[in-house]
Swiss-Prot record:
It comes from Homo sapiens. Proteolytically processed after NMDA receptor activation. Cleaved in a calcium-dependent and calpain-sensitive manner. Calpain cleavage is essential for the translocation process from dendrites to the nucleus. InterPro entries: NSMF (IPR033374). Residues 125-137 have a biased composition (Basic residues). The keyword Cytoplasm applies. Couples NMDA-sensitive glutamate receptor signaling to the nucleus and triggers long-lasting changes in the cytoarchitecture of dendrites and spine synapse processes. Part of the cAMP response element-binding protein (CREB) shut-off signaling pathway. Stimulates outgrowth of olfactory axons and migration of gonadotropin-releasing hormone (GnRH) and luteinizing-hormone-releasing hormone (LHRH) neuronal cells. A lipid is attached at residue 2 (N-myristoyl glycine). This is NMDA receptor synaptonuclear signaling and neuronal migration factor.
Length: 530
């Protein structure tokens, strides 16, 4: 029940709005005719009176018309008779001249109104015909129930400027505009008579009852503008999102470049400054590391008695006696082996595979010195025992019973430490605590010469051990481990005079410089150079 009532109210409101639109359209067309043809001004008054009188009552009190889609406006002819007369005879539709049909279009600003609506009428079909100045058939002038006798003694309003002169009866029948015609007594807009707009086609439909199908034609320009606005808003939204993403990407890229350049700057400049400022602090902290702790001394568990003291002293004396005997025996055997003619004391090169381009080092040694023995060992998998066995085997191959006079250890490392094997770093603290490292250096000392009048030399290349005070401590601890053999350790800078002398002792200096220049290069294979 409520839905039906609301539906009827909606239909009534639509009907009233349609009636108001027709009245506004009638007045607009009348003003258009008055401006275009000043002599036909009475035609506009008749048109307004007809439109208003047809819809004077409310839509509820009027009977439903036969055709809701008829605008009931006539273009050819003038009104005859009073507005209150009812035609008694209705002729068939086929008789008499064909009326023109006017449609409502939404062109802007031809009729000012409070709702800013502008509605005008456009002639869409009909033929211009001349009719005699006699009374014609009566036509229905309004769908509201009142019928008028309309005659066509005049020519078309839009086609001739002489309608009112030829038909003076039309001027007598024209009533003045009433002030209750929905406020349509406003002054007409000035419009050039020669300027006429082409209007899009649209039919005005009165929707009052449900038995009439709805066939509304929306104006083409309004539909197009609506679609264009929607598409434009979507395009603007998409473009804004795309522009925002591009802006964020540019900002992120610029921030990444700035951060990368800043990190590079810190590596090139700031790191050196920080290193200079914190060198003393890092040196102090190095002594507090676990591997830098001094070796704890074992507690003396022996009884504090004279017997135990005498036993220890006698044991030490016996060990020293055996060591002296072994020392003398080994020294005599080495002297006998070195007495042969043409004997050259051997120089052993211990090369770690961790050194870049280490496989080319045996090819750049001095070719005029056959006493140089290169030994390349695997940094990842070799052990201290493997290295010692390889040194003994190469010495026996070179000359049986020969010992090392000079030795070069070419490996990676740094100030204060020596990187001999994987997970085996020689530092001044570790050579005192780790058993395998202590055993390696002691066995290596037994392979050094005992008949050399000068101390045996072990050169360190590939790193600068003495760049840190811990390097001197490391050398001192190694010398202590290798006693009673006289061994000295040297690690000069390669660009110094001592460094050049060390290089010339083992390498061809020209080939060594060439190898050094290609050591970290991937552009040229060293085999091609050699």
């Amino acid at each position: 029940m409520g839905a039906a009532a609301s539906r009827r109210r909606a239909l009534r409101s639509e009907a009233m709005s349609s009636v108001a639109a027709k009245v506004r359209a009638a007045r607009a067309f009348g003003e258009y005719l008055s401006q275009s043809h000043p002599e036909n001004r009475n035609g506009a008054d008749h048109l307004l009176a007809d439109a208003y009188s047809g819809h004077d009552g409310s839509p509820e009190m009027q009977p439903a018309p036969q055709n809701k889609r008829r605008l009931s406006l006539v273009s050819n002819g003038c009104y005859e008779g009073s507005l209150s007369e009812e035609p008694s005879i209705r002729k068939p539709a086929g008789e008499g001249p064909q009326p023109r049909v006017y449609t409502i279009s939404g062109e802007p600003a031809l009729l000012p109104s409070p709702e800013a609506e502008a509605i005008e009428l456009a002639v869409v079909k009909g033929r211009r015909q001349r009719h005699p100045h006699h009374h014609s058939q009566p036509l229905r002038a309004s769908p509201g129930g009142s019928r008028e006798d309309v005659s066509r003694p005049c020519q078309s309003w839009a086609g001739s400027r002489q309608g009112s002169k030829e038909c003076p009866g039309c001027a007598q029948l024209a009533p003045g505009p009433t002030p209750r015609a929905f406020g349509l007594d406003q002054p007409p807009l000035p419009e050039t008579s020669g300027r006429r707009k082409k209007l899009e086609r649209m039919y005005s439909v009165d929707r009052v009852s449900d038995d009439i199908p709805i066939r509304t034609w929306f104006p083409k320009e309004n539909l197009f503008s609506f679609q264009t606005a929607t598409t434009t808003m979507q395009a603007i939204s998409v473009f804004r999102g795309y522009a925002e993403r591009k802006r964020r990407k540019r900002e992120n890229d610029s921030a990444s470049v700035i951060q990368r350049n800043f990190r590079k700057h810190l590596r090139m400049v700031g790191s050196r400054r920080v290193k200079a400022q914190t060198f003393a602090e890092r040196r102090e902290r190095s002594f507090s590391r676990s591997w830098s702790d001094p070796t704890p001394m074992k507690a003396d568990t022996s009884h504090d008695s004279r017997d135990s003291s005498d036993l220890q002293s006698s044991h030490c004396t016996l060990d020293e006696a055996f060591e002296d005997l072994d020392w003398d025996t080994e020294k005599g055997l080495e002297a006998v082996a070195c007495d042969t003619e043409g004997f050259v004391p051997p120089k052993v090169m211990l090369i770690s595979s961790k050194v870049p381009k280490a496989e080319y080092i045996p090819t750049i040694i001095r070719r005029d010195d056959p006493s140089i023995i290169p030994i390349l060992y695997d940094h990842e998998h070799a052990t201290f025992e493997d290295i010692l066995e390889e040194i003994e085997r190469k010495l026996n191959v070179y000359h049986k019973g020969a010992k090392i006079w000079k030795m070069l250890i070419f490996c990676q490392g740094g100030p204060g430490h020596l990187y001999l094997l994987k997970n085996k770093v020689a530092t001044f603290a570790k050579v005192e605590k780790e058993e395998d490292m202590i055993h390696f250096w002691k066995r290596l000392s037994r392979l050094m010469s005992k008949v050399n009048p000068e101390p045996n030399v072990i050169h360190i290349m590939g790193c600068y051990i003495l760049g840190n005070p811990n390097g001197e401590k490391l050398f001192q601890n190694l010398r202590t481990l290798m006693t009673p053999y006289r061994v000295t350790f040297e690690s000069p800078l390669e660009l110094s005079a001592q460094g050049k002398q060390m290089i010339e002792t083992y390498f061809d200096f020209r080939l060594y410089r060439l190898w050094k220049s290609r050591q970290h290069s991937k552009l040229l294979d060293f085999d091609d150079v050699l």
